């Protein structure tokens, strides 16, 4: 027993050191032990009640959240299934839903395209996310993705299928080892949102970032022309396996790629001008044009006289008319020109069936304003609500349609077959209900001429068509113009086009840029916001070519074997002082770039007189014999820094005053524009597994809201029926059940622990 310490002088109420121990009786000790045990049990019971009350509260919240999410998904499923029957889309219900959507003004999908008769892709872009939906006429696996050049190697793919009610979905890529089967990415950057199949179709909806920041396996979705890859097969992989070699016959499942622009497009639903009594429709067709044999080009001109448009109308849409599926392969461009004046040749041509454009002597000057322009791959163009192209017989009654025929992939086995006749053309829609602004077309670029030289065997050749500040300063209104759409054109070796804008000596962001252009798809792009251009701006069409596959030089011209560098812009308000704003390297620049000092006078063919080592050589021979491999740098520097001839024409066949005597030079830019690529950290998704379920309710609540489809946006038979699987609802139910069972097990274990403590 411890001894008490010696007392010190302290206040009576304060005691230092441990208190003195006193002896207790056994009965008192027993009573104290029982009291402590009862207190401990009471504390445990209170702890049990508090903890379990809190956990029961959490459990109720979990169940309520699960029921609410399941109800939302079930409602969405019922909307889809309610608009269709088991065999296809219910016409009455679909019409009702479409009418309701139209009445509410809510968008359905931004864009939709049929890649073939059995495969439709729909998409919507919200901020930096893009959501796709595949509707494919198959009960096997489907795939959709992107390729940098149309080849399988390096392709970025999303693959999925539905098997026994379970959706399988993976982010994949095609390796460069020659195997066409896409393999699963180590980083899963595509998120499944919905998957089902019915008696005929498989439907998958999924989301990804425009730029997933995974350049090793994914392709960023930009304003460039994308090469869309798609595939589908009648069978699913066995047992849902995603291991290499389990995808049935991928080489045959792939279909030919389609070049397409995904971002700068007019949104759906487009207006239906044919059902508007205020809209007039006019078909401008060629008449029995004999298509050229082989790969020979043909430029055909057909004049139309429109005399019955007695008051001002606005052109609001145009689209191609194909005479037959065979003629599609021949059509390259269709351009509708507005002709000024009443020349005798215009009236003469209006009475004719048409003629080759080279036989129209004064047409290029009389018909200098472009009304509409269509290129291969385009589905037409719809003007925005703020502008339309003005049409009125008192202003212009003659319209020239120029059609460029050129079959890039001719079947020479049919060379001696009977020539086909074509009656293709343009369908235009115009209305007397005028838009707020008159629209105009301005062509910017390199004038088609032999002085536009592209050397052979080079990966990157830069050409620039300059619209100089003298011409924009003269023609543009004081408040400037608003550019709302752009079409970029090259021919077969063009790879990149940019429309640059320079104000004084500062380069502004490019008006348009495509670093992956495709000759098979050159359409007008609707800019997200109109770009303002002021008088005195310099506009430059910069084109980059890859001539590494060519052994001889390529010259500028109109045929597909020659090259082009043109950017067509649609803008408002319209002005007539400037419709063509091109440039052309000056003859001294061309000669200097080839090491030529002087040409001989009055020589035919053209001969070189100096320097002495080239004297007597023809200009054509110099073009052929020039050492392009070792002297390309000097050539490129001379053409970009040398002088050029501005070509500025207005709608009424007038040259911009003073421009015919100007000699232009490249502008000294003191502040260049550089785009910085910024990749935000990726949101981690589930690692690749053999079964990838849709995201849980918490993730689904963050996905962009997509209104269900009307009859026009569901491929026939693709609607969900009563027999369709709905894995999103089932997966959510399974997830909620697992959480509920886990909570019950936890409560049971904690109760057993409490009973054990009470017994001890």
UniProtKB/Swiss-Prot annotation:
UniProt-recorded Gene Ontology molecular function terms: copper ion binding; dopamine beta-monooxygenase activity
Chief subcellular location: membrane
Subcellular location: Membrane
Disulfide bond residue pairs: 339-367, 467-581, 543-565
Record: glycosylation sites: 78, 198, 223, 668
UniProt GO cellular component terms: cytosol; extracellular space; secretory granule membrane
Ranges of residues in domain DOMON: 117-233
Keywords recorded for this protein, A-Z: Disulfide bond, Glycoprotein, Membrane, Transmembrane, Transmembrane helix
UniProt GO BP: dopamine catabolic process; norepinephrine biosynthetic process; octopamine biosynthetic process
Parts of the chain that traverse the membrane: 47-67, 740-760
Membrane topology: Multi-pass membrane protein
Keyword Nucleotidyltransferase applies: no
Pfam families in the record: Cu2_monoox_C, Cu2_monooxygen, DOMON
Biased composition (Low complexity): 18-34
Keyword Protein biosynthesis: no
Disordered: annotated segments: 1-34, 678-701
Membership in a protein family: Belongs to the copper type II ascorbate-dependent monooxygenase family.
UniProt-recorded name of the protein: MOXD1 homolog 2
Protein's organism: Drosophila melanogaster
Gene: olf413
């Amino acid at each position: 027993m411890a001894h008490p310490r010696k007392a010190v002088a302290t206040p009576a109420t304060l005691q230092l050191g441990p208190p003195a121990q006193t002896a207790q009786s056994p009965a008192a000790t027993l009573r104290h032990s029982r009291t402590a045990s009862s207190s401990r049990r009471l504390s445990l019971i209170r702890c049990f009640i508090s903890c379990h009350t809190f956990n029961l509260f959490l459990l109720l919240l979990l169940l309520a959240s699960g029921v609410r999410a399941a109800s939302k998904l079930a409602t969405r499923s019922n909307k889809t299934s309610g608009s269709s029957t088991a065999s296809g889309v219910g016409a009455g219900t679909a019409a009702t839903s479409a009418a309701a959507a139209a009445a509410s003004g809510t968008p359905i999908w931004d864009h939709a395209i049929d890649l073939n008769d059995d495969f439709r892709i729909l998409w919507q872009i919200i901020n930096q996310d893009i959501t796709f939906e595949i509707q494919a006429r198959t009960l096997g696996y489907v795939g959709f993705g992107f390729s940098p050049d149309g080849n399988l190697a390096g392709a970025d793919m999303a693959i999925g299928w539905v098997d026994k009610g379970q959706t399988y979905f993976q982010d994949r890529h095609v390796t460069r080892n020659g195997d066409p089967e896409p393999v699963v990415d180590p980083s899963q950057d595509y998120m499944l949102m919905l998957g089902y199949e019915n008696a005929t179709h498989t439907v998958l909806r999924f989301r990804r970032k425009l730029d997933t920041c995974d350049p090793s396996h994914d392709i960023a979705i930009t304003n460039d022309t994308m090469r869309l890859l798609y595939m589908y097969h009648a069978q699913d992989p066995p047992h849902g396996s995603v291991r290499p070699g389990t995808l049935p016959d991928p080489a045959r499942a792939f279909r030919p790629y389609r070049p397409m622009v995904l971002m700068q497009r007019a949104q759906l639903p487009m207006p239906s001008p044919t059902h508007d009594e205020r809209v007039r429709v006019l078909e401008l067709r060629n008449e029995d044009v004999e298509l050229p044999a082989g790969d020979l080009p043909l430029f055909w001109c057909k004049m139309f006289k429109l005399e019955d448009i007695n008051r001002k109308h606005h052109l609001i849409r145009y689209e191609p008319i194909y005479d037959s599926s065979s003629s599609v392969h021949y059509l390259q461009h269709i351009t509708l020109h507005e002709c000024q004046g009443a020349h005798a040749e215009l009236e003469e041509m209006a009475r004719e069936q048409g003629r080759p454009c080279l036989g129209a002597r004064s047409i290029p000057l009389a018909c200098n304003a472009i009304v509409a322009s269509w290129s291969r791959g385009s589905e037409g163009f719809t003007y925005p609500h703020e502008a339309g192209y003005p049409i009125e017989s008192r202003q212009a009654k003659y319209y020239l349609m120029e059609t460029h025929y050129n079959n890039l992939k001719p079947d020479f086995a049919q060379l001696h077959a009977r020539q086909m006749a074509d009656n293709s053309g343009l369908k235009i829609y115009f209305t007397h209900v005028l838009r707020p602004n008159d629209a105009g077309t301005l062509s910017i670029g390199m004038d088609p001429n032999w002085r536009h030289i592209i050397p052979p065997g080079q990966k990157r050749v830069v050409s620039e068509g300059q619209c100089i500040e003298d011409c924009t300063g003269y023609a543009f209104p004081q408040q400037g113009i608003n550019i709302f759409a752009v079409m970029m054109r090259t021919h077969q070796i063009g790879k990149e086009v940019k429309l640059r804008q320079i104000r004084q000596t500062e380069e502004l962001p490019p008006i348009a840029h495509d670093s992956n252009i495709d000759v098979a798809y050159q359409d007008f792009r609707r800019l997200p916001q109109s770009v303002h251009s002021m008088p005195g701006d310099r506009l430059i069409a910069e084109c980059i070519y890859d001539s590494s596959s060519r052994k001889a030089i390529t010259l500028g011209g109109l045929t597909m074997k020659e090259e082009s560098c043109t950017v067509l812009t649609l803008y408002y308000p319209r002005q007539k002082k400037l419709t063509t704003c091109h440039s052309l390297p000056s003859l001294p620049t061309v000669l200097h770039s080839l090491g030529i000092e002087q040409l001989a006078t009055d020589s035919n063919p053209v001969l070189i007189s100096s320097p002495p080592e080239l004297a007597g050589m023809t200009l054509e021979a110099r073009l052929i014999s020039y050492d392009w491999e070792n002297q390309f740098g000097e050539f490129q520097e001379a053409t970009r820094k040398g002088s050029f001839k501005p070509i500025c024409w207005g709608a009424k066949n007038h040259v911009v005053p003073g421009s015919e005597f100007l000699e232009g030079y490249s502008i000294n830019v003191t502040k260049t524009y550089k785009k910085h690529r910024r990749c935000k950290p990726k949101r981690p998704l589930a690692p690749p597994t053999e079964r990838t379920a849709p995201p849980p309710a918490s993730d689904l609540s963050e996905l962009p809201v997509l209104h269900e489809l009307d009859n026009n946006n569901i491929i026939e038979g693709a609607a969900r029926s009563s027999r369709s699987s709905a894995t999103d609802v089932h997966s959510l139910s399974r997830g909620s059940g697992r959480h509920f069972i886990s909570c019950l097990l936890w409560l049971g274990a904690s109760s057993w622990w409490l009973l054990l403590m009470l017994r001890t």
